[in-house]
Amino acid sequence: MNKLTHFDDSGQAHMVNVGDKPATHRIAIATGKITMLLETFKMVETGNHKKGDVLGIARIAGIQASKRTADLIPLCHPLALTHVSLEFRLDSTTSTISCKVRAETTGPTGVEMEALTAVQVALLTIYDMCKAVDRGMVMGDIKLLEKSGGKSGEWKLA
């Protein structure tokens, strides 16, 4: 198992020094989903929600969240993101909305946390916009699907 990098030799938390690492193009793709009542799902799917375009607002929230990740995760480096996109897939058979995020940067550290944060905030935004009609929505299956770039190279979830 690899050593935990956010702790120094005496066990104290610290921000990893990435100053000597080369800048490389880095990509991370993450996903998650939210399941809801069929009536709630139909409201989102048809765009008939009184608060407006639920998925459009969730997309903007996810992008904003990716840019604020370092403010939320204490030892996460602030990054200059070069691209963030969110894709939603609607499955009416399970009343589930899946969110997939692709985040990119060119720099000395990866964008996994930015992609994961974007997924979670997008799903939370859907929950927030729909909670008046469905408090029983369930978010889950949030995970990193793949990452590339840097010293560790390519990684894909098996």
Curated annotation (Swiss-Prot):
NCBIfam families assigned to the protein according to its UniProt record, in alphabetical order: moaC, PRK09364.1
UniProt cross-references to InterPro entries, sorted A to Z: MoaC, MoaC_bact/euk, MoaC_sf, MoCo_biosynth_MoaA/MoaC, Mopterin_CF_biosynth-C_dom
Subunit: Homohexamer; trimer of dimers.
GO biological process: Mo-molybdopterin cofactor biosynthetic process
Family: Belongs to the MoaC family.
Active site: 128
Uppermost EC category: lyase
Enzyme Commission number, as recorded: 4.6.1.17
Species in which this protein is naturally found: Polynucleobacter asymbioticus (strain DSM 18221 / CIP 109841 / QLW-P1DMWA-1)
Protein name (Swiss-Prot/TrEMBL): Cyclic pyranopterin monophosphate synthase
Pathway(s) this gene product operates in, as recorded in its UniProt entry: Cofactor biosynthesis; molybdopterin biosynthesis
Pfam families the UniProt entry points to: MoaC
CDD domains, alphabetized: MoaC_PE (cd01420)
Function: Catalyzes the conversion of (8S)-3',8-cyclo-7,8-dihydroguanosine 5'-triphosphate to cyclic pyranopterin monophosphate (cPMP).
Keywords in alphabetical order: Lyase, Molybdenum cofactor biosynthesis
Name of the encoding gene: moaC
